[in-house]
Swiss-Prot record:
Region feature Disordered, mapped onto this chain: 105-182
Alphabetized GO MF terms: RNA strand annealing activity; RNA strand-exchange activity
Subcellular location: Cytoplasm
Name under which the protein is recorded: RNA chaperone ProQ
Function: RNA chaperone with significant RNA binding, RNA strand exchange and RNA duplexing activities. May regulate ProP activity through an RNA-based, post-transcriptional mechanism.
Domain of life, per lineage: Bacteria
Gene that this polypeptide is encoded by: proQ
Keywords, alphabetical: Chaperone, Cytoplasm, RNA-binding
Amino acid sequence: MENQPKLNSSKEVIAFLAERFPHCFSAEGEARPLKIGIFQDLVDRVAGEMNLSKTQLRSALRLYTSSWRYLYGVKPGATRVDLDGNPCGELDEQHVEHARKQLEEAKARVQAQRAEQQAKKREAAAAAGEKEDAPPRERKPRPTTPRRKEGAERKPRAQKPVEKAPKTVKAPREEQHTPVSDISALTVGQALKVKAGQNAMDATVLEITKDGVRVQLNSGMSLIVRAEHLVF
């Protein structure tokens, strides 16, 4: 006998039962109420198939009959079915009421879980310093300048006259000279200046005579100059 694949979860077992007994079990949509004692029928019919154990079958049945879609199907006037889909009696009021309470409790548990999750999210957001978005600040409209009409001449911008700083004319610096008062104090080779009007020319003493001082200008010309025309 070949090894058969093993079903690992109750959902896989329910999918197998829906395929094996399609008139009794369903994988989706509203489920039909099951026959009382259907567990033993399953043990007898699927013994050895898919390596299913009684524990797996019992867990799968518990999950199937506690699902919302099964509890929705347990309502007044509904009929129980066996593995082949044959009717096995109408639901009594006690079973309908029990299913209604189970459904309400299941919904309440889900709502409580959602509320708890929302509270945890809010606490986490508060701990992280996240604040609700503040209302946007109203922006003041920027003053609009009147737009130039199409075809209107554009006025040239008035240019500000650039004020030029008045130029200061520097007066020529007048050289200060010291007149030679005693020619006997002069020495040959000494540098001095010879006054000629408003100017003074550089010169060198060549000889001191009784008539004055013989000097040589930078131009190479030599001449005798009296003391009143000599300055330092």
